Amino acid sequence: MALSHYLRVLLQGIVLAAMMLGVSAPAIAGPQRTEAQAVIVTPLSFFKVDDLIFGRILPSSTAGTVTVAPDGVRTKTGGVTLFNGGGEQPSRFAGRGAANQIVAISLTSTPNRLTRVGGTQTMTLSTFVIGSTPTVVLTGTNQFFRINNTSGIFNFPVGATLAVGPNQVAGNYAGTFVVTLNYQ
């Protein structure tokens, strides 16, 4: 009988331990950090608001192009397939000049390429278009626009075309292009 008493006490202990493990205590989430940013805009300045993103692209054995227009519409030619939900968007810039001021805008004329992160494969960017009325193709030569807002604040999108090679190597591609403004 002593053995059955010990088994009963042991079994009660196991049941009690199981019940205690099943009781949940309030969970306390650890603190999380986030970032805060501000841009102080001075007269005769401008800054990048958004990056140019071409989104997700599936290459094939045939070369093709992907264009993101200044209005955000994405189109393709040739042997590429576009996936939705890739975050595609034109680059956006904003700044401040004076009302009715003329501004010269140009694009650095060096070859503009995206290079595969961790690799050497490239894709070429071309036909940069500023979202104005009418739209203007950006080159190394100055193009001009007028600041129409009475506050002098302006913004504009820039789209471009990406050349995707046949059987382009998969991966993330990144690069830069430089837009220059000269206030007249």
Positions of PLM-derived features:
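N-terminal secretory signal peptides that target proteins for export/translocation
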Residues: M1-L7
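Hydrophobic alpha-helical transmembrane segments of integral membrane proteins
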Residues: L10-L11, F154
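Bacterial N-terminal signal peptides
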Residues: L11-G22
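Bacterial Sec-dependent signal peptides at the C-terminal "C-region" and cleavage site
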Residues: G22-I28
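N-terminal small/polar-rich segments of proteins
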Residues: I28-T115, F144-Q184
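Terminal beta-strand-rich extracellular "head" domains
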Residues: A104, R113-T141
